[in-house]
């Protein structure tokens, strides 16, 4: 009897020892991964379909750009919902609505064939639903792990980042093969099944209703005003950290997402094969950063945040130098790729420090709203970075743009150090 008792209680002890080995967290991660995989698989299929039908790569890019504004405006409503209702219910409803949206559009395409307007509406709706789900997931993590401290929160964020990176890389690898083999419509079927499966999985997550805090707030506007007062009056250092993260997103989006492909393809003149290999390495480095972050999560306290930003700035310097001095194309490609991989690792570690600090710096009834406002700020910075760097690379030499980027990243260190001392 003693041996049997020990065998049955050992899993409970190991589960208690590691809060991440819980059924609810595993279901949350599974639902998130399936939903993200379905979303990105659909985006890839639609981009290929639009390109085949219109011959214009800019058409689908314009659709994605048009979805940014409603996403920024409506994302805070997701934060309000996350703090007002059961977060499990919100996640299930949003994934179910995503499945219904794709199903309706698939029926339209089956009856009428290719329709660019329907694709545009579908992508805008899905972008808004995804932006509303993100703060819900980010608010669910503190609800699960707040009592275990920031170390566990950082480990949980690392797991979520690994899932995000994997779910981003897999559709990029499989998307082309599937589209060539079966076409867009069967891939829409895969997406519908994916969203539906995510909703079913999330139904089994056990999450209670969040603490409403001040029940006097009766409208979404009241909730957002309360979040604004909280950030500006009660916890201004949290607001400053949100703004720093938005500034980082501006730099990384501009120099990595815009500058890296421009320098490899246009400045250095490499073909799609070399760029695809380099892009794959950069994507894998983000996954590596999340894995490393999970291993060293206990040491990633806020006092390490300035070191992460300093490491990020140092990854830009070799690129500025190699694009300024005389060097061969292969050497420049190697330095650009290796340094951008370093950038992705440094930024991933910085996110693992900053995001849990923001989450843990908010009370239960503010987490969703604050995270949604942080998401909106980052989304505002993203197109600004794309536009600014697109203009800069077309006017100035790549080495000069990178040198200015290095200077801006270095200039962030004093305010970063100041904010760090407040946590």
PLM regions: where:
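Juxtamembrane intracellular "pre-TM" segments in multi-pass secondary transporters
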Residues: 5-25, 208-243
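Substrate-agnostic recognition of the 12-TM MFS/MFS-like secondary transporter fold
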Residues: 27-43, 67-80, 86-98, 118-180, ...
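Hydrophobic alpha-helical transmembrane segments
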Residues: 116-123, 127, 152-213, 280, ...
């Amino acid at each position: 009897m003693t041996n049997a008792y020990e065998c049955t209680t050992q899993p409970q002890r190991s589960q208690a020892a590691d809060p991440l080995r819980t059924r609810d967290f595993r279901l949350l991660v599974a639902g998130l991964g399936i939903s993200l995989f379905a979303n990105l698989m659909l985006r890839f299929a639609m981009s290929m379909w639009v390109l085949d039908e219109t011959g214009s790569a800019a058409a689908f890019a314009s659709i994605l750009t048009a979805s940014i504004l409603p996403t920024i405006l409506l994302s805070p409503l997701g934060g309000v919902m996350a703090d007002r209702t059961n977060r499990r219910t919100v996640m299930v409803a949003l994934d179910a609505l995503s499945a219904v949206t794709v199903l309706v559009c698939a029926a339209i395409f089956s009856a009428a064939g290719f329709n660019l307007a329907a694709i545009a509406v579908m992508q805008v709706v899905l972008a808004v639903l995804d932006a509303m789900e993100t703060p819900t997931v980010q608010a669910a993590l503190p609800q699960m792990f707040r009592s275990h401290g920031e170390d566990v929160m950082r480990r949980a964020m690392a797991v979520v980042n690994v899932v995000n990176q994997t779910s981003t890389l897999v559709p990029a690898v499989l998307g082309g093969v599937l589209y060539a083999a079966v076409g867009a419509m069967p891939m829409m079927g895969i997406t519908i099944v994916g969203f539906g499966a995510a909703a079913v999985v999330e139904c089994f997550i056990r999450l209670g209703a969040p603490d409403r805090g001040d029940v006097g707030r009766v409208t979404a506007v009241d909730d957002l005003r309360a979040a604004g007062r909280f950030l500006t009056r009660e916890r201004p250092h949290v607001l400053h950290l949100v703004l720093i993260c938005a500034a980082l997103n501006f730099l990384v989006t501009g120099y990595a997402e815009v500058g890296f492909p421009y320098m490899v393809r246009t400045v250095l003149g490499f073909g799609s094969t070399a760029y695809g290999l380099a892009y794959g390495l950069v994507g894998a480095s983000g996954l590596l950063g999340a894995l490393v972050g999970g291993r060293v999560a206990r040491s990633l306290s806020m006092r390490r945040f300035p070191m992460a930003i300093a490491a990020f700035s140092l990854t830009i310097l070799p690129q500025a130098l190699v694009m300024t001095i005389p060097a061969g194309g292969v050497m420049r490609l190697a330095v650009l790729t290796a340094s951008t991989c370093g950038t992705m690792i440094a930024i991933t570690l910085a996110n693992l420090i900053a995001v849990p600090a923001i989450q843990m710096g908010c009370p239960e009834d503010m987490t969703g709203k604050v995270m949604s406002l942080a998401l909106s700020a980052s989304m505002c910075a993203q197109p600004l970075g794309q536009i600014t760097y697109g203009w800069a690379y077309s006017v100035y030499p790549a080495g000069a743009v990178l040198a200015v980027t290095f200077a801006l990243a270095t200039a962030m260190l004093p305010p970063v150090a100041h904010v760090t001392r407040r946590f």
